[in-house]
Amino acid sequence: MPDQISVSEFVAETHEDYKAPTASSFTTRTAQCRNTVAAIEEALDVDRMVLYKMKKSVKAINISGLAHVENEEQYTQALEKFGGNCVCRDDPDLGSAFLKFSVFTKELTALFKNLIQNMNNIISFPLDSLLKGDLKGVKGDLKKPFDKAWKDYETKITKIEKEKKEHAKLHGMIRTEISGAEIAEEMEKERRFFQLQMCEYLLKVNEIKVKKGVDLLQNLIKYFHAQCNFFQDGLKAVESLKPSIETLSTDLHTIKQAQDEERRQLIQLRDILKSALQVEQKESRRDSQLRQSTAYSLHQPQGNKEHGTERNGNLYKKSDGIRKVWQKRKCSVKNGFLTISHGTANRPPAKLNLLTCQVKTNPEEKKCFDLISHDRTYHFQAEDEQECQIWMSVLQNSKEEALNNAFKGDDNTGENNIVQELTKEIISEVQRMTGNDVCCDCGAPDPTWLSTNLGILTCIECSGIHRELGVHYSRMQSLTLDVLGTSELLLAKNIGNAGFNEIMECCLPSEDPVKPNPGSDMIARKDYITAKYMERRYARKKHADTAAKLHSLCEAVKTRDIFGLLQAYADGVDLTEKIPLANGHEPDETALHLAVRSVDRTSLHIVDFLVQNSGNLDKQTGKGSTALHYCCLTDNAECLKLLLRGKASIEIANESGETPLDIAKRLKHEHCEELLTQALSGRFNSHVHVEYEWRLLHEDLDESDDDVDEKLQPSPNRREDRPVSFYQLGSSQFQSNAVSLARDTANLTKDKQRGFGPSILQNETYGAILSGSPPSSQSIPPSTTSAPPLPPRNVGKDPLTTTPPPPVAKTSGTLEAMNQPSKSSQPGTSQSKPPPLPPQPPSRLPQKKPASGTDKPTPLTNKGQPRGPEASGPLSNAMALQPPAPMPRKSQATKSKPKRVKALYNCVADNPDELTFSEGDVIIVDGEEDQEWWIGHIDGEPSRKGAFPVSFVHFIAD
């Protein structure tokens, strides 16, 4: 800030200069004087704008107040007139009451009018005079005289300095500076004029300060007293009316009783008269129905079925304008909708849902008919009467067809029906999850409102508070009222109220319970929900510094740990920050980039959490790639759906100038291209279905008693963790959505068979094996049932088993090659087979870190299905798909060891010493490794031998 001079300093310096010009230092303070004037001008300009807005507001209050007074006066006049009418009509008690309220309102109106006038006189007039007087004009007008004096002073001093320097130069000397004392006498006139203008300016500023400060506050004090008088006088008027109001209440009760008695007598008389005229009314009603045959009927007349339900052609439509002209329009009827084209081609056609319309004939014109929609009536005219009848029949037939489809459903929409059934099953299981039987916030029973971005259920009262927080905190949907897509249930299936509150309510104070109950009011709910979700006041905090938070976020995404991710969210980590991943695919990746490039069928909910709770879905890597670019590079349509639902930008280009759509077209990823095209045209449905391993719990209703006795059933409390069965395909052909959906709901469409159908397909979305080579000779055919979880096995204790080396990580990212437009592609190129994968640890839980190193990058290539939700590292394109990582299983009581057993499920060996077999294979038991694993070989194939899990077979009686 430049140096300035205060008023007291200016006065002292000017006095000193006036007494001793040659000894004064005023010449050195002139620049400070100018800085002071400039600063004062800035402040005055700001004050001028604020005072102008204040004046404008006061004026608006005055205008609206006078309008209010006028309306009050009209209301008073109406009360007075109505009371007078009551007095004249033998209702003196009611009339006097209305007149009292008229007088009371008139008194309050007069007081309010006086208050408005006082505000105008006390505040508005002084402000107006100040703005039109001292503060009139624009910025800089007030200091113009000062600026002129400054300019004259500077011109004179520059001229004198130049003359002094030239004089010294003539005498052979060089002068760089001229002291103030040397030119004090020559500059006295200009200096005095400068001081005078500065003094005048400060005087004006002082006056303005008084008027906009002290004087304005004095006026506000006067207005305060006027307000006090208004409220005191109003209170006196209220107190004077109180006794009359109390008496009036008693009188009104008496009058009401008398009127009720009159009403009772009239009702009795009406009933007597009705019973006498009952027969005549029935006959009259029958005649009326005959006369009103052309009126509206709930059941519309049936159309001629010969004309069908679809039609295209031209009709004349009467315009809505003043002229009411007939305009020729192209019309089409199809699938329960009437489409009416406009006269101009660039306008989209109007589309009417016939279920909300009514077709009526026009009695005046035989070739005209009316279509009554919910908001207007369309008048149509056909070429002739026969054409009119055809159009009306088609409209009625199409409406009837749409109505039947709405009530009965369409048998041809198998995929949609499967999605609906799957959604219902998911919602049912979500409601059965631990803690989901009560509201997550207040404990009210049977919550039906879902926060899709947090995966919790709340009651309707708490859901209203969630909506007030905004969608960046909680996105509420109704499980019963809204039509949900499976994508909106991902987090609900994986989090739930119990797991969420274990983190977000970990630090609730026990001595002072703050959590609301079902009977709490909305204020208590709002205070608690705001503290819980916005401030995260009660959440468990594990990390304080930013580096530790980002590291925990990175680990949660790598290990596919949803509760670890929720913990990072509770710690307050920025989900869009660059994560500390030294060996990422591209520099400056975010957690969303990492989640997208390492996603599989079991970890889509990790991506969904990041998509819904990140403030920015368009963060770019060092090479300009967004998460959408990653999806299109790997043909990851499921993640693409989640990002498009979250409104991620599809226009951003990477460093190569390619948008996600450009990449999808170049790599011929048709599904991604179709989704992006839908988003560009605004046709993308946010309630979208996604392919995901839901692992629903279903009852085996159709099993025989023999099957139940014969099988070794897995423990019921472990069914949630059971891995799904799978099968391999010999080619890289993509599977249709209907197949994928049927896989997810196999138990719904196949008489509630056990578990799922095949659940791991060669779909690029989840890392397809794109090798063109056929499967191995021991590839497993599809299984109709799901296998129970594999028991833990310590393979290291077998002396014949050697631990295989770890898999070789790919160092050359396939994505770099995909980023560059290639001249030719050879999908059938053979690849060397890496060493087999390491064995699974003896026991692993879902949320614990995996034993294998998770710091290795997961290449953004079309990869095989990972071994489980926690597994990481790429799989070779030549290797068989592995099932998800099995969960440890409690040992069950087994029968005496037989010699021969039969396989219940398909099983693919994870280790070289294990046996691969298919459902129905007979296995000869050679020995027992432990209680859960036996040794044996396939009957008739002694070369196929190894360890197998007991829970995958059943006994064959000798």
From Swiss-Prot:
SMART domains in the record: ANK, ArfGap, PH, SH3
Effect annotated for changing R467A: Abolishes Arf-GAP mediated stimulation of GTP hydrolysis
Keyword entries, A-Z: ANK repeat, Cell membrane, Coiled coil, Cytoplasm, Golgi apparatus, GTPase activation, Membrane, Metal-binding, Phosphoprotein, Repeat, SH3 domain, Zinc
Result, substituting L481A: Reduces Arf-GAP mediated stimulation of GTP hydrolysis 100-fold and abolishes Arf-GAP mediated stimulation of GTP hydrolysis
PTM (free text): Phosphorylated on tyrosine residues by SRC and PTK2B.
Modification type Phosphothreonine: residues: T861
Molecular-function GO terms, alphabetical: GTPase activator activity; metal ion binding
Coiled coil: 259-286
Keyword hit for Ion transport: no
Biased composition (Low complexity): 768-787
Domain PH residues, every copy: 308-400
Topological type in the membrane: Peripheral membrane protein
Residue spans of biased composition, Pro residues class: 833-844
Subcellular location: Cytoplasm; Golgi apparatus, Golgi stack membrane; Cell membrane
Any one Pfam family match given in the protein's UniProt record, by short name: PH
Residue span, SH3 domain: 896-958
Main location: cytoplasm
ANK repeats: 587-619, 623-655
Compositional bias ranges of the Polar residues kind: 290-303, 811-829
Subunit structure: Binds PXN, ARF1, ARF5, ARF6, PTK2B and SRC.
Function: Activates the small GTPases ARF1, ARF5 and ARF6. Regulates the formation of post-Golgi vesicles and modulates constitutive secretion. Modulates phagocytosis mediated by Fc gamma receptor and ARF6. Modulates PXN recruitment to focal contacts and cell migration.
Free-text note on domains in this protein's UniProt record: The conserved Arg-467 in the Arf-GAP domain probably becomes part of the active site of bound small GTPases and is necessary for GTP hydrolysis.
Protein name: Arf-GAP with SH3 domain, ANK repeat and PH domain-containing protein 2
Organism: Mus musculus (Mouse)
